[in-house]
Amino acid sequence: MNSQLTLRALERGDLRFIHNLNNNRNIMSYWFEEPYESFDELEELYNKHIHDNAERRFVVEDAQKNLIGLVELIEINYIHRSAEFQIIIAPEHQGKGFARTLINRALDYSFTILNLHKIYLHVAVENPKAVHLYEECGFVEEGHLVEEFFINGRYQDVKRMYILQSKYLNRSE
């Protein structure tokens, strides 16, 4: 079933789905962002960033065209060939193994199409399931950031994790 997941560019028609994700406090706490964004604000952001080469945003569809989640590469730096990775799986689709498939698809795109050198992410220390998943996908801890983000009324530590193109491309050899 995971093989039937498709990454495609975020389109204006997907904004209602994104709006629902962005207004879920639990989801946004994992992205270290403020929830409860207005739809007008989201549309403005979409219009502002639609042609921004420093970002790639994808929605995830299953074979029936149901929206499953969102995958983003942001802060793309074409000199240093690096980008930050972010992922959201809609709550009703979590726990089905989709994240692992989508992480690998995003890494494949990053390293074989964009020819990036390094992909990094930030994950809450208090989210051991996500840390473990990222480690299984080849990410390595690069640093521990103390009280980096203010979420749910308190500051939280995060791990910065990374994977290099060479490690990803040589993983099966």
Swiss-Prot record:
SUPFAM superfamilies referenced in this protein's UniProt entry, alphabetically: Acyl-CoA N-acyltransferases (Nat)
Catalysed reactions, as listed in the record: an alkane-alpha,omega-diamine + acetyl-CoA = an N-acetylalkane-alpha,omega-diamine + CoA + H(+); spermidine + acetyl-CoA = N(1)-acetylspermidine + CoA + H(+); spermidine + acetyl-CoA = N(8)-acetylspermidine + CoA + H(+); spermine + acetyl-CoA = N(1)-acetylspermine + CoA + H(+)
Gene Ontology molecular function: any one: diamine N-acetyltransferase activity
Keywords assigned by UniProt, alphabetized: Acyltransferase, Cytoplasm, Magnesium, Metal-binding, Transferase
InterPro entries with a match to the protein in the record: Acyl_CoA_acyltransferase, GNAT_dom
Every N-acetyltransferase domain range: 5-162
Binding site for Mg(2+): 33, 75
Any single biological process term in GO: spermine catabolic process
Location in or out of the cell: Cytoplasm
GO cellular component: cytoplasm
Pathway annotation: Amine and polyamine degradation; spermidine degradation; Amine and polyamine degradation; spermine degradation
Binding site for spermine: 28, 33, 41, 49-52, 84-86
Function: Involved in the protection against polyamine toxicity by regulating their concentration. Catalyzes the transfer of an acetyl group from acetyl coenzyme A (AcCoA) to the primary amino groups of spermidine to yield N(1)- and N(8)-acetylspermidine. It can use polyamines such as spermine and N(1)-acetylspermine, but not putrescine or cadaverine.
Assembly description: Homododecamer; dimer of hexamers. Exists in solution in a variety of protein homooligomeric states including dodecamers in an open state. The presence of the polyamines spermidine or spermine shifts the equilibrium to dodecamers and induces the formation of the closed, symmetric dodecamers.
Assigned protein family: Belongs to the acetyltransferase family.
Name this polypeptide is given: Spermidine N(1)-acetyltransferase
